[in-house]
Amino acid sequence: MAVDMFIKIGDVKGESKDKTHAEEIDVLAWSWGMSQSGSMHMGGGGGAGKVNVQDLSFTKYIDKSTPNLMMACSSGKHYPQAKLTIRKAGGENQVEYLIITLKEVLVSSVSTGGSGGEDRLTENVTLNFAQVQVDYQPQKADGAKDGGPVKYGWNIRQNVQA
């Protein structure tokens, strides 16, 4: 399944030409996760620890957002919000089925590189954040929405549900 992916980070402008996501950053790939430090290997109860939330990482083409992201990483600038949006590509009724909203965002790394055989240079960017909200929209076989979104939210700083 082909998908369209975009990220909007504060006032940083990208080069997306998409009608709905104009001037956002086109995302080629992304990853994010979390782990729990609890242990079920010994003792009688098996306790849970504090969740370890990873930085969100994404790959993009080098574009006009690049110098701004580099400056934000260098200076430690914080953005109030970043939003990663993913939808199925093509068709008339494109449903944005996964939206990840980050709050209190810091650009934690920018890694640029390439080789002579590539058409366009790419870079990897990682974002650190204090709070996350995930909205997943189930879809029917025909692509229509199937009910409302399923949500997850966590305040990382306070280690509580958001």
Swiss-Prot record:
Conditions for induction: Transcriptionally repressed by RetS and activated by LadS.
GO cellular component: extracellular region
Record keyword Secreted present: yes
Keyword Calcium: no
Subcellular location: Secreted
One Pfam family of this chain: T6SS_HCP
Alphabetically ordered keywords of this record: Secreted
A GO molecular function held by the record: identical protein binding
Family from the record: Belongs to the hcp1 family.
Function: Required for assembly of the protein secretion apparatus HSI-I. Actively secreted during chronic infection of cystic fibrosis patients.
NCBIfam families reported for this sequence: VI_effect_Hcp1 (TIGR03344)
The protein's assembly and partners: Hexamer. Three hcp1 monomers form two closely related hexameric rings with a 40 Angstrom internal diameter.
Miscellaneous comment in the UniProt entry for this protein: ATP hydrolysis by the first AAA domain of ClpV1 is required for Hcp1 secretion.
Protein name as it appears in the record: Protein hcp1
Organism the protein comes from: Pseudomonas aeruginosa (strain ATCC 15692 / DSM 22644 / CIP 104116 / JCM 14847 / LMG 12228 / 1C / PRS 101 / PAO1)
